[in-house]
């Protein structure tokens, strides 16, 4: 098992390129299942544990996969299975994305109940409701979701989500693209990753209106054709790197980004006293000598993202005052706080609100990751802590950050990956 060893106190400077979005790559890869001929070529697919697991899953289903550099080529014309097994699905919740495409293309799908990050309840009921609205019969047997159509194709219907859901919106879009008739989706997610999925599906021949809005209309088509498509940048990775610069009082530039996807995050960095300079497809953050305490409420896009909440808490440990952090997406997403407090942070949890008292002198110790973004939060804390911090179980980090220690080291961090033996008690 791997850990990251960080000697804190180094100011980050320099320039780094943003990776492709993990949260966009996974539904894009799933959408290739909708093509019954030819090869889809996806550019800017990050090399991550989750993207590799998704490639394994498609290969298990019978797809031909080729990955080189950041280009992924997928041919799904010879699929031989409609079951996504527990052995693969347990590794990440996003495996549920294959449900809609398999059901739309073959009329049947069996998907193991998902795994992934362990924080709070994240039900899949909205995915199942969407499939039922398109005419599927759903049952759960022996730990598997079993979905089927009595005959023919899925049929268009009206899907109204009671709450915004990125995953359920993506699954509904993919299934509806091959459904017979018209599907309308209200309260659809407007995250950039969903807009990218719409763009990919439309490039393949899907008829989708309203991309980027909460109201989508999909006219089903008989088939989709393979295309080449470039993934969007990872706004969460970019935000994490900006936080790394801010917490170390550094100055960094990130290239290959679209700043319009980061409006809420950049606004908060500015409120905290950081200077942001935008230039075409890059931006530069210059940290102030004194960070100002800045409250956040994590909510669906276009508001501050829940996937940046943990990193913001780490940053606010160095702010000159107290900050309030509320997560309206995942109310219980505070597993990182006890570990931050072990480093010397002073953070209270009051119901669904975290109160961060800063500035606090953090000192290095051994901490343990509990999920993907908690891992990033602990790395940020390690960058500013005095002495040596060891972050264990960084396999969580590898699910969503491409070569993160290499990027941080390039910017001046003293960070190394080492292997260690974890003993059970």
UniProtKB/Swiss-Prot annotation:
Q: Which residues carry this modification: 2-(S-cysteinyl)pyruvic acid O-phosphothioketal?
A: 117
Amino-acid positions noted as binding phosphoenolpyruvate in the UniProt annotation, renumbered to this chain = 22-23
Residues at the catalytic site: 117
Kindly list the GO molecular function terms attached to this UniProt entry.
UDP-N-acetylglucosamine 1-carboxyvinyltransferase activity
Q: What top-level branch of life does the organism fall under?
A: Bacteria
List the subcellular locations. Answer: Cytoplasm
Against Pfam families, the record matches this protein to:
EPSP_synthase
PANTHER family registered for this protein in UniProt: UDP-N-ACETYLGLUCOSAMINE 1-CARBOXYVINYLTRANSFERASE
Which NCBIfam families does this entry report, sorted A to Z?
murA, PRK09369.1
What's the protein here called?
UDP-N-acetylglucosamine 1-carboxyvinyltransferase
């Amino acid at each position: 098992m791997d850990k990251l060893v960080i000697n804190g106190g180094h100011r980050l400077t320099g320039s780094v390129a943003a990776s492709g979005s993990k949260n966009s790559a996974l539904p894009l890869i799933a959408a290739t299942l909708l093509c019954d001929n030819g090869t889809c070529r996806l550019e800017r697919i990050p090399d991550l544990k989750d993207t590799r697991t998704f490639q394994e899953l498609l290969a298990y289903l019978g797809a031909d996969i080729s990955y080189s550099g950041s280009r992924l080529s997928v041919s799904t014309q010879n699929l031989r299975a409609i079951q996504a097994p527990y052995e693969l699905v347990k590794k990440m919740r996003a495996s549920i994305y294959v449900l809609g495409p398999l059901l739309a293309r073959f009329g049947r799908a069996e998907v193991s109940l998902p795994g992934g990050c362990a924080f709070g309840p994240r039900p899949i009921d909205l995915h199942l409701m969407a499939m039922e609205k398109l005419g599927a019969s759903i049952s759960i047997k022996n730990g598997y979701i079993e979905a089927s159509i009595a005959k023919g194709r899925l049929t268009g219907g009206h899907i109204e989500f009671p709450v915004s859901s990125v995953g359920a919106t993506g699954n509904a879009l993919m299934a509806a693209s091959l459904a017979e008739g018209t599907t309308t989706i209200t309260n659809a997610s407007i995250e950039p990753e969903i807009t990218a999925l719409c763009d990919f599906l439309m490039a393949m021949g899907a008829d989708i209106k309203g991309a980027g809005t909460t109201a989508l209309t999909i006219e089903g088509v008989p088939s989709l054709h393979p295309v080449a498509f470039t993934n969007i940048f990872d706004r969460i990775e970019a935000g994490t790197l900006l936080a790394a610069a801010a917490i170390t009082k550094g100055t960094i530039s990130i290239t290959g980004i679209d700043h319009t996807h980061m409006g809420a995050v950049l606004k908060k960095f500015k409120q905290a006293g950081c200077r942001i300079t935008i230039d075409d497809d890059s931006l530069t953050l210059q940290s102030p000598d004194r960070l100002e305490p800045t409250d956040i409420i994590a909510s669906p896009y276009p508001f501050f993202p829940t996937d940046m909440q943990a990193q913001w808490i780490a940053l606010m440990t160095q702010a000159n005052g107290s900050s309030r952090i509320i997560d309206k997406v995942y109310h219980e997403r505070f597993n990182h706080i006890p570990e931050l407090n072990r480093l010397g942070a002073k953070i209270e949890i009051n119901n669904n609100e975290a109160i961060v008292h800063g500035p606090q002198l953090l000192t290095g110790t051994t901490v343990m990751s509990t999920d993907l973004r908690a891992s990033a939060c602990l790395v940020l804390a390690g960058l500013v802590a005095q002495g040596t911090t060891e972050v264990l179980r960084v396999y969580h980090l590898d699910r969503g950050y491409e070569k993160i220690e290499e990027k941080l080291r390039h910017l001046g961090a003293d960070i190394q990956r080492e292997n260690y033996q974890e003993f059970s008690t």
